[in-house]
From Swiss-Prot:
Membrane topology field: Peripheral membrane protein
Protein name, as recorded: Photosystem I assembly protein Ycf3
Species in which this protein is naturally found: Anthoceros angustus
SUPFAM superfamilies assigned: TPR-like
Free-text function comment from the UniProt entry: Essential for the assembly of the photosystem I (PSI) complex. May act as a chaperone-like factor to guide the assembly of the PSI subunits.
Intracellular or extracellular location(s): Plastid, Chloroplast thylakoid membrane
Record-linked NCBIfam families: PRK02603.1
Pfam families xref list: TPR_1
One GO CC term on file: chloroplast thylakoid membrane
Length: 170
């Protein structure tokens, strides 16, 4: 039984029903419908913390999906899972791939900045101020790009940029 038929909560069930209706109405190929079904099942599994199942669905969606814009969101979600699992290098790779296909993903840039900031914090704990500055500068670059795409978002990042003197665009 597909995951989409196992949804227990009202919102997921409603979303699934609406998505199924739209898939029937909108003229798309069978391949596109299958890709969307795997993407939707991946999101459902991911929201329940079933990351292995989510990844299987996302990889299958990637195999089927040909639209770069749609692929960007699949790649972004794969990046989220790797971030949640603490696999930051892998997560960064997927965020980069998502941005290559869709440069208007401020959430990917924000997540990349958060990872770089975290690595900067780790460098502080390890007593390596030079490496810390490199990571913080990289985080600042990503946050500035994210903020330029979504100026009313990322208020904490905007404050951090001001406080650390990194708010000026290079």
């Amino acid at each position: 039984m597909p995951r989409s038929q196992k949804n227990d909560n009202f919102i997921d069930k409603t979303f699934t029903i609406i998505a199924d209706i739209l898939l029937q109405i909108i003229p798309t190929t069978q391949r596109e419908k299958e890709a969307f079904t795997h993407y939707r099942d991946g999101m459902s599994a991911q929201s329940e913390g079933e990351y292995a199942e989510a990844l299987q669905n996302y990889y299958e969606a990637m195999r089927l999906e040909i639209d770069p814009y749609d692929r960007s969101y699949i790649l972004y979600n794969i990046g989220l899972i790797h971030t949640s699992n603490g696999e930051h290098a892998k997560a960064l790779e997927y965020y980069f791939q998502a941005l290559e296909r869709n440069s208007s993903l401020p959430q990917a840039l924000n997540n990349m900045a958060v990872i770089c900031h975290y690595r900067g914090e780790q460098a502080i704990e390890e007593g390596d101020p030079e490496t810390c500055e490199v990571w913080f500068d990289q985080a600042a670059d990503y946050w500035k790009k994210a903020i330029s795409l979504a100026p009313s978002n990322y208020i904490e990042a905007q404050n951090w940029l001001r406080i650390t003197g990194r708010s000026k665009i290079k």
